[in-house]
Amino acid sequence: VSAVEQSAFGPFFTVEAHAADETPTPPWRSVSGLVDGSPSLGGRISAVRSSLAARMAKTAAEVDLRVAASVTHLGLIARILAPTIAAATRGVRISQAPDDLWWQDRLGGPFPLSVLKTESGQREGECSAVPGAAVESITRCVVGETGVSDRVLWGNVGSAANSAAQLIAASRPALTGAARDIADTYLRDPRVDGGVLRAGPDFRRRSCCLIYQLAEDRTAVCGDCVLETRTGATG
């Protein structure tokens, strides 16, 4: 999938590409830095926590660390899975090895992401690395860093996969089936709500990403949340 085709699905799908023999230079950094025990992940969570606090006119200490951790995790995972799923619908596999993914640590929207240049012809659904090393490693490290429930975080993985499929379907209806099939390779993972959910407009996760706690309003939940009701959702 070309960069132009990817970007047509939305900003979360836009990627740059680098060769295997290239080394990231600032502001680029390897995703491996988020999962190697360095301060990068904790720093990202702290920055998100401060940003959320500023938006809610609170202090950082007033934002539950678990909420900031879940928001951080969902943002990272959604950014990685969106282009991965889009590429896979066209038969292209994007490596999810942390060393093969570069990112720029920015807030305020989808951060820049660069992926390893790959050859066409291998579908992500045919690859054994599903959900993928980056997804698994980031999820494990967020749990270790903050103690947030792994059920919440794997629910985030499901939400990210389904959201990517829905955005692709909305932009390119002809790819609806392919996008949902690829998303389902993630949703079948037993860590994602038992592996029984499937992609589509009726997707409803069995956990909450905790974002509603920022508004202190139980009705301010995402449309795919276990807490969502038809009369009380905000999207």
Segments and roles (model prediction):
Residues 1-67:
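Generic N-terminal leader/targeting and pre-domain segments
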Residues 8, 192-193, 233:
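Intrinsically disordered, low-complexity segments enriched in small/polar residues
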Residues 8-11, 27, 97-99, 109-111, ...:
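Generic structural motif recognizing short loop/turn segments at the entrances and edges of beta-strands
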Residues 11-15, 30, 105, 113, ...:
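Intrinsically disordered, low-complexity regions enriched in small/polar residues
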Residues 27-30, 145-149, 171, 228-231:
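General structural signal for secondary-structure boundaries
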Residues 38-201:
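Hydrophobic, aromatic-lined core segments that form the binding pocket/scaffold
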Residues 82, 86, 93-95, 217-220, ...:
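Nucleic-acid modification enzymes, centered on SAM-dependent nucleic-acid methyltransferases
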Residues 205-230:
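Local cysteine-cluster metal-coordination motifs and their immediate loop/turn environment
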